[in-house]
Curated annotation (Swiss-Prot):
Disulfide links within the chain: none
Pathway linked to the protein: Quinol/quinone metabolism; menaquinone biosynthesis; menaquinol from 1,4-dihydroxy-2-naphthoate: step 2/2; Cofactor biosynthesis; ubiquinone biosynthesis
Primary gene name: ubiE
Species the sequence originates in: Proteus mirabilis (strain HI4320)
NCBIfam families: MenG_MenH_UbiE, PRK00216.1-1, PRK00216.1-3, PRK00216.1-5
Protein name: Ubiquinone/menaquinone biosynthesis C-methyltransferase UbiE
EC id: 2.1.1.163, 2.1.1.201
Keywords for the protein's UniProt record, in alphabetical order: Menaquinone biosynthesis, Methyltransferase, S-adenosyl-L-methionine, Transferase, Ubiquinone biosynthesis
Binding-site positions, S-adenosyl-L-methionine: T74, D95, N123, A124, S140
Protein family according to the UniProt entry: Belongs to the class I-like SAM-binding methyltransferase superfamily. MenG/UbiE family.
Catalytic activity: a 2-demethylmenaquinol + S-adenosyl-L-methionine = a menaquinol + S-adenosyl-L-homocysteine + H(+); a 2-methoxy-6-(all-trans-polyprenyl)benzene-1,4-diol + S-adenosyl-L-methionine = a 5-methoxy-2-methyl-3-(all-trans-polyprenyl)benzene-1,4-diol + S-adenosyl-L-homocysteine + H(+)
GO biological process terms held by the UniProt record: aerobic respiration; menaquinone biosynthetic process; methylation
Length: 251
């Protein structure tokens, strides 16, 4: 066995070979893709729409710009960005999972969003775009599933234009202890049951909960973005820190 194959990472609370995580995460999202939007509404009581709306407002995206919606899944952010950039702008919806990408493409086309959106199956760690290419990159509820987060952040930095910005919307660490206890009880006991009823897959939503707990907290992620080269990194807690929006610039 090579040294590289012995390198491990987390898959929820499990420790797995780095080479295996991508395949394991892919199975999760293949399983949940068809009910992904419904489950988001049920799990968050619809609040995910508020979090995403705030992200759009914080992005500063304008007409004629080029935006990368990374781990864009079913295209919620892409749909909004498409309107903001206009017919001469461009939005690239990228996702490593072909099932999610297919759902996003079908959903946006059903809504008549076709002219300025393209679709790319891509690994966040090795983005297939030129240097200094995008005005803005967003990654929404996707970074925690990436095997090598530091490498992915460096890849995002590379493809951003000078003056461009990265926004990372992700589950984080609640800042109030009572909220944290309620959140834990809901996440570990109720979410998997919802997943079992709606998707017939409790394990995928158990992984979701565990992956959130293993994700870097607010200050740690801020430091990782700075190490990747981003300047003026800041974050905003939402819903008591259950979710945080990190923002950084490339100068």
């Amino acid at each position: 066995m090579t040294q590289q194959s012995k390198e491990t990472t987390d898959f929820g609370f499990q420790t797995v070979d780095k080479d295996e995580k991508q395949t394991m995460v892919a199975k999760v999202f293949h399983s949940v893709a068809s009910k992904y939007d419904l489950m988001n509404d049920l799990m968050s009581f619809g609040i995910h729409r508020v979090w995403k709306r705030y992200t759009i407002e914080a992005s500063g995206v304008r007409r004629n710009q080029r935006v990368l919606d990374l781990a864009g899944g079913t295209g919620d952010l892409t749909a909004k960005f498409s309107r903001l950039v206009g017919e001469n702008g461009e939005v690239v919806l990228a996702d490593i999972n072909d099932s999610m990408l297919k759902m996003g493409r079908e959903k946006l086309r059903d809504h008549g969003i076709v002219g300025n959106v393209s679709y790319v199956q891509a690994n966040a760690e090795e983005l297939p775009f030129p240097d200094d290419y995008f005005d803005c990159i967003t990654i929404s509820f996707g970074l925690r599933n990436v095997t090598d987060k530091a490498k992915a952040l460096r890849s995002m930095f590379r493809v951003l234009k000078p003056g461009g910005r990265l926004l990372v919307l992700e589950f984080s660490k609640p800042v109030l202890d009572p909220l944290s206890k309620i959140y834990d009880a809901y996440s570990f006991h109720i979410l998997p049951r919802i997943g079992q009823v709606i998707v017939n897959d409790a394990d995928s939503y158990r992984y979701l909960t565990e992956s959130i707990r293993m994700h870097p907290d607010q200050e740690t992620l801020k430091g990782m973005m700075e190490e990747a080269g981003f300047d003026q990194v800041s974050y905003t807690n939402m819903t008591g820190g259950i979710v945080a929006l990190h923002k950084g610039f490339k100068f």
